[in-house]
């Protein structure tokens, strides 16, 4: 009787374990699937942000061959093509995205950015016009400002640049763009202030430094501004000032600036040497 009870208990235990195994297996598989989805999402984010742009393009192209209906992969491909400097190819991909029923306002903003990179200003404006006014982002206003610039709608441009600058903790880029807009309008004093502000946020931004010197030279301020500069940067900016001085007829000042650029540069400054030689032989 005792043997029968033990056998019965043993059999019950085996059946119970078997039932548990049957119950747990799908749960384990579901858990693994969830992990795979998370890993895939993380990998997609990595590819779109920090991975080598061309590697990211290859990754999304391979992924779309396996799963052509994945709109997130299509978005990833478009963004990666932009990062890789292949805006013309990205435009083709964005055409598919904005034609999809899941298109978002951000998709249209991204498409507008790609269109601007290929000088398709009117098409870019058309895409932004399809974005509802309630969708307010830094990127949207930055692009709107650039489009307003292209239309010479200066009041709109200034308004959009100001809004964009207030919507980011890193406004150096948009302030530099705004300054360049002022520079092209001939408002050199305002441009100078904006370039200085841009540099205050990013002390290594050479484009803003060069633009600052252009704005100052346009006002015949032929001295370097009090900003952080390397020797190489100092030499390049002196050369920039010299070129501006030549264009404004201040040839003697240009000679002095070129001589300073040659003396300041830690390496042989061929461009400055050739420009000075041309001036002296003219």
Roles of regions detected by a PLM:
Residues 45, 79, 113, 146, ...:
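Residue-level recognition of tetratricopeptide repeat
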Residues 71-72, 104-106, 136-139, 171-173, ...:
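Helix-start (N-cap) detector for alpha-helical repeat units in TPR-like alpha-solenoids
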């Amino acid at each position: 009787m005792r043997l029968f009870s033990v056998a019965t208990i043993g059999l019950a235990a085996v059946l119970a374990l078997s039932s548990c195994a049957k119950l747990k297996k799908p749960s384990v598989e579901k858990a693994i699937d969830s992990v795979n989805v998370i890993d895939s999402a993380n990998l997609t984010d990595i590819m779109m942000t920090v991975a080598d742009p061309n590697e990211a393009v290859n990754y999304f192209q391979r992924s779309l061959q396996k799963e052509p209906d994945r709109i997130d992969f299509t978005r990833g491909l478009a963004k990666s093509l932009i990062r890789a400097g292949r805006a013309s190819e990205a435009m083709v991909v964005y055409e598919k995205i904005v034609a999809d029923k899941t298109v978002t306002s951000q998709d249209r903003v991204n498409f507008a950015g790609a269109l601007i990179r290929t000088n398709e200003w009117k098409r870019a404006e058309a895409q932004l016009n399809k974005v509802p006014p309630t969708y307010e982002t830094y990127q949207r206003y930055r692009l709107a400002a650039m489009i307003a610039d292209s239309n010479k709608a200066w009041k709109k441009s200034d308004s959009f640049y100001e809004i964009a600058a207030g919507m980011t903790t890193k406004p150096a880029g948009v302030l530099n763009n705004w300054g360049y807009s002022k520079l092209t309008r001939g408002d050199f004093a305002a441009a100078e202030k904006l370039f200085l502000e841009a540099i205050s946020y990013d002390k290594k931004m050479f484009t803003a430094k060069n633009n600052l010197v252009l704005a100052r030279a346009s006002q015949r301020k032929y001295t370097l501004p009090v900003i952080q500069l390397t020797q190489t940067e100092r030499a390049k900016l002196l050369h920039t000032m010299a070129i501006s001085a030549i264009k404004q007829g201040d040839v003697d000042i240009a000679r002095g600036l070129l001589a300073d650029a040659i003396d300041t540069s830690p390496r042989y400054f061929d461009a400055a040497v050739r420009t000075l030689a041309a001036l002296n032989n003219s």
